[in-house]
Regions:
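A structural signal for multi-pass alpha-helical bundles of membrane permease subunits
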Residues: 2-4, 14-81, 85-91, 104, ...
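Arg/Lys-rich, alpha-helical DNA-contact motif
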Residues: 8-9
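Beta-strand-enriched, solvent-exposed domains that form extended recognition/catalytic surfaces
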Residues: 81-197
Length: 460
C-alpha cells in the first residue's frame, strides 16, 4: 500500500519572514500609488504659486518656496508699507533694492536705466478700474554701488575666469509731498542694461526678462512674505472685479456656490429622508413602481432632459436664480441610500412607539430621524460635493449677470479671460485650487462617516 509523502512544513521563522515580505511589498505598492497621486497634487499646487506655471524645465526652487526670499520679501514689504506679511507701498515707505551685474574682464559695468513703470496689476478686469500707480508716488534714486568679482567658467575652454561685478543699490521712497496718498498694492521696477552685462543676483528674482535679457522686470518689489508666496491667490480675489460695482467676482462666485450647496443639502435631506422612509416602511399601491422610477431616473443623463427642464424654469421665471440650480437635482440617488438605511432600522423600536400611541410621523420625527445621523451625514456630504462640483446646470441656468455665476462656471470665465493668449495660467490654477478647498476640508472632517461600517454602528 503506497503512502503519500508528508508535506514539508516551513519553519515558523521562515513563515514570518514571508508574511513580513508580503506585507512590505503591499505597503510599498500603496506608498508608491499614494506618492504618484499626491505628487501630482503637490506639483500642481507648486505651479499655482509660480508666475509662469508652464515654464520648461519645471523648477523646484524659486522665490515662492524659498525661505530666504520670504524673509527678504517681508523686509521689503515692511519698508514699503509697514506690513511684513502683505507688503505694499504707502506714505512713509522707504526701501533699498540691490541688484548685481557682471561683465567680461575689461568691460566697464555701467549703471542700468532704472524705472518704476506705470504698470497695471495684470491682464484681468482690475486693470480697467485701477487708478493708483506706484510710478505717480515713487521717488527712485541710486543710493550707492559696490564692486566685487566672481568666478565664471568659460564654456568654450572649460577654464575658470575672474569676472568683475558691481552691485547697485536703488532707493525707492514714497514722495513726502504726497503724504496723503493711497496705499498701493504693487511697486514694479524695470532695469535696462547693456547687452554685455548680465544680472547675476538681486534681492528678489526678476518676474521676467525682456529684450533678450537686456531688461529685467519685477512686478512687485514690496510683496511681503505672504504676498510673495500667495500672489496668484491674492490676484484671484483682487483682480476679478465687477466693472459696475468694483466688488470681487471670485468672492461672489464662492458665496453663490456655498448658498446653492447648502440649499441643496437642506432640501436633499428633507425630501430624501421622507421619501426613503415612505418607500421603506409604508405599504401602498404603486410603491414598487415609484421605486423603479427612482432607479430609472438615475440612469438618465442630465443632458437628455435639460431642454425640457430649461423651458420649465423659463416659464416659471426661475432662470438666473439660485433656486433653479438648487432644485434641479435635489434627490436622485439619495432616496435610495435613505431607503436602504431605513430598511435596516429595527422595526421593534417603531412598533413599540406605535403601541404607546405615537403617530407614524411622530415615530419618524422623534425616533427614526434622530438615530439616522450617520446616513444623513453621508447624504449631506455627497449632496454638498455634487452641488459644489456641478458645472452643467449652473452653466445652463445661470448666464447673467457675471456675479451670479458659481465658482465652477467662474473658473471657465477665468480660463477665457486669463488663459489662452494672455497666458496667465498661474491665476487660473490658483482659482482652481481655491475651489477644491471646501470639499477637501469637508472630507477631512467627516471622512469617517462615509464608511459603511459607521452607518451600521449608528443603527446599533
Amino acid at each position: 500500500m503506497a503512502t503519500t509523502p508528508a508535506k514539508r512544513r516551513l519553519p515558523v521563522d521562515a513563515l514570518r519572514r514571508r508574511q513580513v515580505a508580503a506585507s512590505a511589498w503591499v505597503y510599498l505598492i500603496f506608498i508608491a500609488l499614494a506618492t504618484v497621486m499626491l505628487g501630482t497634487f503637490v506639483v500642481a499646487f507648486m505651479a499655482s504659486l509660480k508666475v509662469d506655471p508652464l515654464e520648461r524645465p519645471f523648477r523646484l526652487v524659486y522665490d515662492q518656496v524659498s525661505p530666504s526670499a520670504w524673509f527678504t520679501g517681508a523686509d521689503l514689504g515692511k519698508a514699503g508699507a509697514g506690513d511684513a506679511l502683505w507688503g505694499g507701498f504707502a506714505p512713509g515707505g522707504d526701501l533699498t533694492f540691490d541688484v548685481t551685474f557682471t561683465a567680461p574682464p575689461g568691460t566697464d559695468i555701467e549703471e542700468p536705466a532704472a524705472e518704476v513703470p506705470r504698470r497695471r496689476p495684470g491682464t484681468g478686469l482690475a486693470a480697467a478700474v485701477m487708478k493708483d500707480f506706484a510710478s505717480d508716488y515713487a521717488l527712485l534714486s541710486l543710493a550707492g554701488t559696490s564692486d566685487g568679482s566672481m568666478d565664471v567658467t568659460n564654456d568654450a575652454t572649460g577654464e575658470t575666469e575672474r569676472w568683475p561685478t558691481r552691485t547697485f543699490s536703488y532707493r525707492i521712497a514714497y514722495d513726502p509731498a504726497k503724504a496723503d496718498g493711497p496705499w498701493i498694492e504693487r511697486t514694479p521696477l524695470t532695469l535696462t542694461s547693456p547687452t554685455s552685462q548680465t544680472l547675476v543676483s538681486s534681492d528678489l528674482s526678476p518676474t521676467r526678462f525682456e529684450r533678450r535679457g537686456r531688461v529685467a522686470s519685477w512686478d512687485n518689489i514690496t510683496p511681503g512674505a505672504l504676498g510673495l508666496i500667495f500672489n496668484n491667490y491674492r490676484r484671484v480675489i483682487t483682480e476679478t472685479v465687477d466693472l459696475s460695482t468694483g466688488n470681487s467676482l471670485f468672492a461672489g462666485w464662492l458665496l453663490n456656490s456655498f448658498v446653492i450647496a447648502f440649499g441643496r443639502v437642506i432640501m436633499t435631506i428633507a425630501l430624501a429622508s421622507l421619501a426613503g422612509y415612505a418607500l421603506a416602511r409604508l405599504k401602498f399601491n404603486g410603491a414598487r413602481l415609484i421605486f423603479a422610477l427612482v432607479l430609472f431616473s438615475m440612469t438618465i443623463p442630465a443632458q437628455v432632459t435639460f431642454v425640457s427642464n430649461y423651458l420649465i424654469f423659463r416659464d416659471f421665471g426661475l432662470l438666473n436664480t439660485q433656486f433653479s440650480v438648487i432644485i434641479v437635482l435635489v434627490v436622485g440617488s439619495h432616496v435610495l441610500l435613505m431607503k436602504q438605511f431605513f430598511e435596516n432600522f429595527p422595526k421593534e423600536i417603531e412598533e413599540a412607539a406605535i403601541v404607546d400611541g405615537t403617530s407614524r410621523f411622530g415615530v419618524f420625527w422623534r425616533i427614526v430621524l434622530p438615530n439616522s445621523m450617520p446616513a444623513i451625514l453621508v447624504n449631506a456630504i455627497m449632496a454638498f460635493q455634487a452641488a459644489w462640483n456641478d458645472f452643467f446646470w449652473p452653466l445652463v441656468l445661470l448666464t447673467s449677470p457675471p456675479n451670479a455665476l458659481t465658482v465652477q462656471v467662474g473658473l471657465l470665465s477665468l480660463r477665457r479671460s486669463y488663459g489662452g493668449a494672455q497666458g496667465d495660467w498661474g491665476l487660473v490654477l490658483a482659482g482652481a485650487f481655491i475651489s477644491i478647498v471646501p470639499v477637501l476640508v469637508l472630507f477631512i472632517l467627516f471622512q469617517r462617516y462615509i464608511e459603511s461600517n459607521q452607518v451600521s454602528e449608528g443603527v446599533k
